[in-house]
């Protein structure tokens, strides 16, 4: 067997007949499989033990030799070698075909490789191969052209005239003769000459043929190997036959297909021996050809061969294709041992890095470890005894299990795993029951809830795997979201509500204005019921020992509330005392206004002071998130995770104490709701009257009515929010960010508003009732449209978004950080991304975490803010924007020169850790996940704006797909191809608008539809590639007009526009990585003196290499233009055939690769997963595995001190 980790590339090619025979261990002569009486394989049959090896370990067929001691003997009675039965998985056989047959992949694939090589049409080939026509192999004196087709009658006629003077053949034999006669060098020369002169269709045909001829010549494949003389038979264990309960047999379809081939082949041999008439032999040969076609790719030609119940049989090609094929089912996604799954329940008492494992599950998962430990501790005498103890679940087993699982992390995964946070590592603790306990804060990352979700557990076995799980995957380490670098573990729901309730202040709380000496005194008073959580009190400032308080502040009294004192207990000591939810208080110091000078107080003391000051807002979800981000910026990840745990415990404790519930009485109905409705009803009547008089059009009336009702809803919403009390439970829930929002509340208490019809158009009759009042039958019916649409949309969206992620991962999986610095001299100019006046992504967000490409000086003081190749930290980014600088050059993935990946400097910081990115990080996969994961949050619908604008703009998920697949967008914009001035805009025929642009040398006119809005006016000067009308630009066209850099920036902007409009933040670098993958190919226009083929797609690096070579030898370089490929196309065009074949169109990719003799250097992740090597990312990179240990010089150090264990 080959050692998987020891080979560096994989090559594929056509197999010669000799090669096939060399693989084989013997010829299969009979179609029999198993003897139904003895259940032994038949001799010379498809399962023959002599050919494929014994069915039982170390035992020959007849039973003469048994046991290992006869290893390697060949039995003299039955001829079976005594060896392991495992060889039946690897030994192949063969069939010697009585007549050559063509391989259907090469003859039938599109384009037909055989046809291109012979310069014959696939129709003609089919006629010859399936015995409908003769092909002239050697014309002799007949005057016929070689490769001419003759019908039966024509052949007879010529044969009578010129007996035995010319050769014409039928079937694959004729094609084989023609293929053997091809002189590849000669063909190449002729084709290259033809390229010089040919044009149009002949040129394209010549280029296609040149590609195939070149492939055969370079790969060393012989064209005649496309015709098979010998057929390989795959090992029997891979096409098994098993007995079912009823004595019947279940068998793989391949056996049926092989049986048909063998039967027909044997019949043909017999006919040839008997010297049967030509027509019978021909018919049999055709049937053999069809049988082999069905075996290789059933259903590719004609009707597929069916088994029982009219089910098409699965041929060899089907074994590879699709989700159930070999690639995706067994090579890329294997099931693993040491895994379990169960329902999840919440574990509020767990620490951030812990999870609860059910006892029984843990025992089963860690069984081998426990068995080993039981034997070592001499609790069990041997392994067998240990096993039975575990199965009986004896008492002593549990203590051992406790010890085994300490410090042994396990991985928890929830499907669908949309991004890297879908699998995280935890330290297990044993729990009773059968549910896995999950820490409440990691639910956001998993997108899990506790309504019956299930999760899977996996055990990392090796020490290295455990170390990686602990260092890289521990939940406490994964606090930031890789897509935008913001914390992903923020408190939610109950935790938010508890902290909100805790920091609430109330005017009428008991003992307001009491003054305390220190916090201990406050907590005692609270415990004894002297003050309430919401009581506003004073505490001597110096008792806090807070480093941010000034001396003056320390001499005063801090005015705060009991709840805030409790809240500040969990905040790190070096922080300011947090008294109000503001960034200033959080980042700098507690505002002066909260410090009261005791000497300045009036008669009423502190109570009077509180009566005259406003209440401070409680801390909501957003502010809690900001606190966590600030702690993360100042301290380590460990401190942050401890802080999160404290915040969680506090939240749960006080949301329990608050006892906040929702009842019908909490929904307050507006008294003047009816008045608002009547008022708007009158407005609608007015509009209808205007329409009836013919003053406005139907569209204008409709838009006005929709606007009136929207306004009514807004007005009701506004008044509702005003009328709510601050202590209303529903208001508290929505205000704190725990659950719900203003719109939900309006529907409960105000009115439901306008609904959309199934077409997406808004129904102009509003639902005026609220849920509190109850809906009428008609209103209920109208609202079902929206509900159903919502559910259908969600289901479709999930599938679409998953498929998008799969394509994105596929195209970017080989982008890995390969080096520290690529030394590029280019950069990307960045500034605000705006759409009209609307800000999409501000400049500061685009530069933070990136490396600068230029020196930036302060425009006034001229001091250097940052030099080239330095990291732009949040502080520096703020300095740059504060200095009034609006654009700068940064290092970007777009301009990176690294082959097969990016370099550290062009990528910037790793958003998941906040540190600089390290060599070996699989940034392509992270980028794909970051773009794909929020896909489910995007909307599906194309907005029907209706009315005046009239154009449907695609948004949401369909727009993202449109961009990444580089399709022509809906609602296309017209762009100018020349620089100049807009000379005139006039009406053309068919109600179109004609825009005339006058340049320096030429004038161009562009047609736009009558309804599209123009973005230019007469006399305006326009740049090349500027848009003349509103809409989306067609990217492929834009590439040829405006060039590479403009197209990259445009695609980046478009992707950001879609996500930001839906409120999803994704960092630029992820989009850059993806867009760069779409633009890595060029199409050769002229080959010059290089070996490149005109019209072919070539990797940009290979193109520059070829030209560098040409310049070196003073030859003519090639010219090419950049090509924009959609992600599906780009994945299939990748250098690695394994990756492409496992993605889509498996047979086409493999056919192509075999002819070219392609070599896969295993650079990406997917290729290595397929063959079972470690992936070349992280610690699996070659630079880490090629280390030599020098044993002789390594110093040996003895450690004698006791090692302390740190708690």
UniProtKB/Swiss-Prot annotation:
It is an enzyme of class 2 (transferase). Mg(2+) binds at residues 449, 451, 453. Binds 1 Mg(2+) ion per subunit. Binds 2 Zn(2+) ions per subunit. It comes from the Bacteria. The keyword Translocase does not apply. InterPro entries: DNA-dir_RpoC_beta_prime, DNA-dir_RpoC_beta_prime_bact, RNA_pol_asu, RNA_pol_N, RNA_pol_Rpb1_1, RNA_pol_Rpb1_3, RNA_pol_Rpb1_3_sf, RNA_pol_Rpb1_4. GO terms for cellular component: DNA-directed RNA polymerase complex. The keyword DNA-binding does not apply. Its cofactor is Mg(2+); Zn(2+). GO terms for molecular function: DNA binding; DNA-directed RNA polymerase activity; magnesium ion binding; zinc ion binding. SMART domains: RPOLA_N. Zn(2+) 2 binds at residues 822, 896, 903, 906. Zn(2+) 1 binds at residues 60, 62, 75, 78. GO terms for biological process: DNA-templated transcription. PANTHER family: DNA-DIRECTED RNA POLYMERASE, DNA-DIRECTED RNA POLYMERASE SUBUNIT BETA. The RNAP catalytic core consists of 2 alpha, 1 beta, 1 beta' and 1 omega subunit. When a sigma factor is associated with the core the holoenzyme is formed, which can initiate transcription. Belongs to the RNA polymerase beta' chain family. This is DNA-directed RNA polymerase subunit beta'.
């Amino acid at each position: 067997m080959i050692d998987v980790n020891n080979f560096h590339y994989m090559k594929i090619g056509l197999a010669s007949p000799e090669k096939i025979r060399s693989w084989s261990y013997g010829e299969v002569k009979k179609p029999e499989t198993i003897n139904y009486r003895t259940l032994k394989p038949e001799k010379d049959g498809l399962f023959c033990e002599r050919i494929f090896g014994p069915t039982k370990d170390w035992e020959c067929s007849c039973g003469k030799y048994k046991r290992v001691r006869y290893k390697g003997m060949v039995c003299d009675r039955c001829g079976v070698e005594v060896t392991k039965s495992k060889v039946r998985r690897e030994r192949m056989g063969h069939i010697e075909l009585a007549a050559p047959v063509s391989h259907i992949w090469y003859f039938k694939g599109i384009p037909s490789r055989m046809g291109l090589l012979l310069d014959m049409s696939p129709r003609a080939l089919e006629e010859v191969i399936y015995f409908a026509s003769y092909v002239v192999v050697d014309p002799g004196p007949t005057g016929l052209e070689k490769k001419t087709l003759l019908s039966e009658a024509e052949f007879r006629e010529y044969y009578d005239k010129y007996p035995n003077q010319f050769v014409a053949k039928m079937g694959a034999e004729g094609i084989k003769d023609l293929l053997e006669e091809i002189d590849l060098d000669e063909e190449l020369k002729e084709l290259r000459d033809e390229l010089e002169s040919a044009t149009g269709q002949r040129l394209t045909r010549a280029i296609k043929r040149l590609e195939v001829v070149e492939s055969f010549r370079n790969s060393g494949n012989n064209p005649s190997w496309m015709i098979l003389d010998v057929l390989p038979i795959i090992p029997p264990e891979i096409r098994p036959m098993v007995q079912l309960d009823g004595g019947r047999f279940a068998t793989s379809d391949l056996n049926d297909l092989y049986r048909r081939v063998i039967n027909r082949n044997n019949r043909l041999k017999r006919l040839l021996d008997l010297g049967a008439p030509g027509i019978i032999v021909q018919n049999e040969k055709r049937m053999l050809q069809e049988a082999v076609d069905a075996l290789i790719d059933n259903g590719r030609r004609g009707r597929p061969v069916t088994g029982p119940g009219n089910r098409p049989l699965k041929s060899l090609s089907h074994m590879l294709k699709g989700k159930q094929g070999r690639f995706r089912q067994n090579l890329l996604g294997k099931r693993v041992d040491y895994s379990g799954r169960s329902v999840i329940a919440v574990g509020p008492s767990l620490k951030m890095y812990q999870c609860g494992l059910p006892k029984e599950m843990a025992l089963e998962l860690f069984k081998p470890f426990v068995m080993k430990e039981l034997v070592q501790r001499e609790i069990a005498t041997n392994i067998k005894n240990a096993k039975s103890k575990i199965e009986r679940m004896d008492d002593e087993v549990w203590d051992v299990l406790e010890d085994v699982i300490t410090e042994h992390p396990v991985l928890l995964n929830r499907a669908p795993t949309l991004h890297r946070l879908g699998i995280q590592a935890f330290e297990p603790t044993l729990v009773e029951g059968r549910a896995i306990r999950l820490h409440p804060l990691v639910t956001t990352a998993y997108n899990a809830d506790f309504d019956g979700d299930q999760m899977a557990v996996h055990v990392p076995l090796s020490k290295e795997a455990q170390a990686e799980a602990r260092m890289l995957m521990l939940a406490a380490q994964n606090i930031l979201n890789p897509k935008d670098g913001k914390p992903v573990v923020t408190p939610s729901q109950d935790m938010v509500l508890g902290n909100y309730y805790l920091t609430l202040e109330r005017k009428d709380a008991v003992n307001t204005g009491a003054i305390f000496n220190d916090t201990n005194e406050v907590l005692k008073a609270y415990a004894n019921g002297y003050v309430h959580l919401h009581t506003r009190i004073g505490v001597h400032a110096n008792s806090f020992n807070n480093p941010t308080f000034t001396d003056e502040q320390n001499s005063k009294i801090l005015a705060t509330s009991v709840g805030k004192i409790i809240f500040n207990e969990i905040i790190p000591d070096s922080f300011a005392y947090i008294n109000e939810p503001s960034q200033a208080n959080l980042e700098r110091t507690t505002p002066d206004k909260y410090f009261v000078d005791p000497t300045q107080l009036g008669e009423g003391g502190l109570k009077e002071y509180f009566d005259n000051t406003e209440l401070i807002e409680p801390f909501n979800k957003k502010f809690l998130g900001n606190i966590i981000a600030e702690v993360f910026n100042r301290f380590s990840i460990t401190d942050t995770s401890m802080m999160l745990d404290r915040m969680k415990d506090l939240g749960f404790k006080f949301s329990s104490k608050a006892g906040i519930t929702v009842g019908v009485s909490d929904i307050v109905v507006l008294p003047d709701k009816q008045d608002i409705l009547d008022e708007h009803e009158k407005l609608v009547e007015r509009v209808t009257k205007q329409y009836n008089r013919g003053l406005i059009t139907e569209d204008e009336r409709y838009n006005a009515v929709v606007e009136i009702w929207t306004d009514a809803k807004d007005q009701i919403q506004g008044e509702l929010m005003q009328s709510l009390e601050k202590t209303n439970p529903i208001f508290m829930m929505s205000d704190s960010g725990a659950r719900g929002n203003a719109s939900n509340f309006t529907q409960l208490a105000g009115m439901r508003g306008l609904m959309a019809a199934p077409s997406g158009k808004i129904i102009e009759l509003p639902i005026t009732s609220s849920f509190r009042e109850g809906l009428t039958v008609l209103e209920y019916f109208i609202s079902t449209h929206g509900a159903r649409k919502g559910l259908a949309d969600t289901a479709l969206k999930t599938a679409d978004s998953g498929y998008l992620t799969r394509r994105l991962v596929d195209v970017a999986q080989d982008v890995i950080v390969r080096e520290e610095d690529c030394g590029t001299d280019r950069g990307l100019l960045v500034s605000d991304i705006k759409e009209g006046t609307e800000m999409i992504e501000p400049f500061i967000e685009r530069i933070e975490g990136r490396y600068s490409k230029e020196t930036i000086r302060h425009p006034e003081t001229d001091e250097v803010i940052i030099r080239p190749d330095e990291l732009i930290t949040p502080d520096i980014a703020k300095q740059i924007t504060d200095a009034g600088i609006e654009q700068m050059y940064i290092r970007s993935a777009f301009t990176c020169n690294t082959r097969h990946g990016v370099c550290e400097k062009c990528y910037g910081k790793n958003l998941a850790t906040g540190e600089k990115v390290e060599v070996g990080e699989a940034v392509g996969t992270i980028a794909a996940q970051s773009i794909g994961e929020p896909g489910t949050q995007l909307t599906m619908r194309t907005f029907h704006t209706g009315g005046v604008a009239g154009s449907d703009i695609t948004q949401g998920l369909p727009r993202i797909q449109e961009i990444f697949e580089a399709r022509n967008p809906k609602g296309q914009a017209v762009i100018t191809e020349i620089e100049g001035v807009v000379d005139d805009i006039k009406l053309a025929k068919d109600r179109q608008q004609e825009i005339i642009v006058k340049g320096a040398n030429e004038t161009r006119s562009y047609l736009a539809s009558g309804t599209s809005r123009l973005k230019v006016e007469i006399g305006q000067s326009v740049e090349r590639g500027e848009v003349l009308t509103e809409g989306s630009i067609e990217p492929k066209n834009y590439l040829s007009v405006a060039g590479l850099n403009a197209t990259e920036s445009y695609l980046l902007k478009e992707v950001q526009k879609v996500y930001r409009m839906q409120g999803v933040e994704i960092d630029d670098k992820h989009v850059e990585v993806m867009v760069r993958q779409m633009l890595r190919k060029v199409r050769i226009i002229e080959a010059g003196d290089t070996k490149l083929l005109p019209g072919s797609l070539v990797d940009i690096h290979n193109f520059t290499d070829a030209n560098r070579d040409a310049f070196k030898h003073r030859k003519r370089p090639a010219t090419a233009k950049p090509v924009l490929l959609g992600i599906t196309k780009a994945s299939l065009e990748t250098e690695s055939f394994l990756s492409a074949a496992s993605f889509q169109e498996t047979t086409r990719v493999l056919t192509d690769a075999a002819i070219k003799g392609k070599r896969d250097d295993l650079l990406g992740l997917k290729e290595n997963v397929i063959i079972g090597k470690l992936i070349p990312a992280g610690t699996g990179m070659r630079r880490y595995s090629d280390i030599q240990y020098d044993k002789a010089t390594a110093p040996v150090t003895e450690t004698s001190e006791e090692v302390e264990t740190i708690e």
